[in-house]
């Protein structure tokens, strides 16, 4: 029997603000000593009154617009009531009936081509504290994270495989980092995911029981956790066992999902409007201002790179994966065009030597760009186009510019990387190659025309790649004909 898989993801993304969602405490908790970024508001002490973070709401709305959502004019902050050690007040300020953003979508590469994944909502809430488990079985609580602004991005059950879920998660991360609302750091918990999955036999109309997998913090784990859970549910159905709606956790060590509790329903949280925060009214003018903040998004820029710069789909995709890379490329293209260098040539340097050096050094583009100016790419290609340097010398000059922050032209002059053309220097190298390889010379004279390629290689090696290959071949042919 075949089975249909239905998946929906809930992405929890911390909003990049300096202060917390409802108080003035610093939201930068990563390296702070435990429980130092706290106050009566985020600790839930009686009488402490919350004040919504304006910038957090603006960035959440910006996210909704980037995800093709409709922004709600009327918003209500609600209390989500439950008890857990990392929730000091006994409730979480969130949204329920009236979320900030509704009815969006994201396009991904599905299993069978482009696929639009619907979004139910994007709502704002506050993060919880962090539990630290000790070796003796105890647990400690750090409340520095409690109250940090958070968005929950809820997809419709439109995903059909673990691979699609991974691609969707990756696309969301790309967009959130691109527009500057989230760091994308999954290791620190700034971006995490809950996955809902159900399985049903082909032909069955109603969905199977939904199982939620909590707190997944990597693309690889999303795919692995869903693959395992789907297989577990299929095995149970084949054995005639019912699937119970429940919450499970992903155990990366064993590669399995582990039962945690029976799945709660919304009624269990007893949502009600937060009495200390009046409804938020967002005007159409305010929403238009947020829309004006929205930059060109990755998909739109990728399409433009293909059309305007005539890049391949692959190159355009690589160069729009990160906004910093994409912006650097555009700056390099603008400078290169003045020199008659094409956008494709710039793309080749970026996706080739530049990315290789970034990987080799472990640097981010932001760090490397403090040395390598965007116009250096066009400069080194111009020297190559003019025949001043060879491809080998161009790579050497580019790497030196990357590491030293000096112009390619300066490096070419200092290192003597200019092409060795016709003249005494080239003649000397050619004669050395002929003298040092008598057997190859003899083969050439007996009619083996390809033997000259070996001699060309010897000259190029001796010149450290600086000799012009065409000039080398011409000089060799002249010398060999003379002897």
From Swiss-Prot:
Task: Enumerate the UniProt keywords alphabetically.
Answer: ATP-binding, Ligase, Nucleotide-binding, Protein biosynthesis
Q: What is this protein called?
A: Aspartyl/glutamyl-tRNA(Asn/Gln) amidotransferase subunit B
GO terms of biological process kind: glutaminyl-tRNAGln biosynthesis via transamidation; translation
Its UniProt entry gives the catalysed reaction(s) as:
L-glutamyl-tRNA(Gln) + L-glutamine + ATP + H2O = L-glutaminyl-tRNA(Gln) + L-glutamate + ADP + phosphate + H(+); L-aspartyl-tRNA(Asn) + L-glutamine + ATP + H2O = L-asparaginyl-tRNA(Asn) + L-glutamate + ADP + phosphate + 2 H(+)
What is this protein's function per UniProt? Allows the formation of correctly charged Asn-tRNA(Asn) or Gln-tRNA(Gln) through the transamidation of misacylated Asp-tRNA(Asn) or Glu-tRNA(Gln) in organisms which lack either or both of asparaginyl-tRNA or glutaminyl-tRNA synthetases. The reaction takes place in the presence of glutamine and ATP through an activated phospho-Asp-tRNA(Asn) or phospho-Glu-tRNA(Gln).
> Which is one GO molecular function term here?
glutaminyl-tRNA synthase (glutamine-hydrolyzing) activity
**PROSITE patterns per the UniProt record, alphabetical:** GATB
Q: Which is an annotated Pfam family here?
A: GatB_Yqey
Q: Which InterPro entries match?
A: Asn/Gln-tRNA_amidoTrfase_suB/E, Asn/Gln-tRNA_Trfase_suB/E_cat, Asn/Gln_amidotransferase, Asn/Gln_tRNA_amidoTrase-B-like, GatB, GatB_C_1, GatB_Yqey_C_2, Gln-tRNA_amidoTrfase_suB_CS
Top enzyme category:
ligase
Entry's EC annotation: 6.3.5.-
Q: Which family would the database say this protein is a member of?
A: Belongs to the GatB/GatE family. GatB subfamily.
Subunit details: Heterotrimer of A, B and C subunits.
Q: Does the entry feature the keyword Protein biosynthesis, yes or no? A: yes
